[in-house]
Amino acid sequence: MVRVSTSEFRVGLRVEIDGQPYVILQNDFVKPGKGQAFNRIKVKNFLTGRVIEKTFKSGESIETADVREQQMRLLYTDQEGATFMDDETFEQELIFWDKLENIRQWLLEDTVYTLVRYNGDVISVEPPIFMELSIAETAPGVRGDTASGRVLKPATTNTGAKIMVPIFIEEGEVVKVDTRTGSYESRVSK
């Protein structure tokens, strides 16, 4: 892959450190009064999710990681995993459940997901940032709930995600949900 110098370090840059793919989360350039300047970076491992700090002397270079993203549509799920299709080439690919555990609650058929690949192999699947989901189950809002300061109630979406929604949301309504935090954003339809 391509080598990048410390002067090219940017947040979001994908690099390879000790044979592992990382993404730069934070980059601080430090020029002490005495001694050589250096970059202190905070990186997240794509495979393990662990965040570590590394220091590089000014002018050092490291390899970029062969991490690519591909947009694919979820066709269906079964006991083995989920089958995705590329909308342009119509190629289908089965992703096993072990790679989908952290997003299982966000799997919805006919939705486009981002498959992250490292050296050609899928290492993770990322859902869209916002999804429109229908409320499958929630308790009815009772008059007087807001008097006790309670303005949110638990709800379960059609994908099985458990979220907190305002008390005026009822079963069957469609809501917009932020998949990064699992929080309610807005009502889509009534």
Swiss-Prot record:
Principal localisation: cytoplasm
Pathway field: Protein biosynthesis; polypeptide chain elongation
Keyword Transit peptide: no
Keywords linked to the UniProt accession: Cytoplasm, Elongation factor, Protein biosynthesis
Entry keyword Protein biosynthesis: yes
Protein name per UniProt: Elongation factor P 2
Entry-linked Pfam families: EFP, EFP_N, Elong-fact-P_C
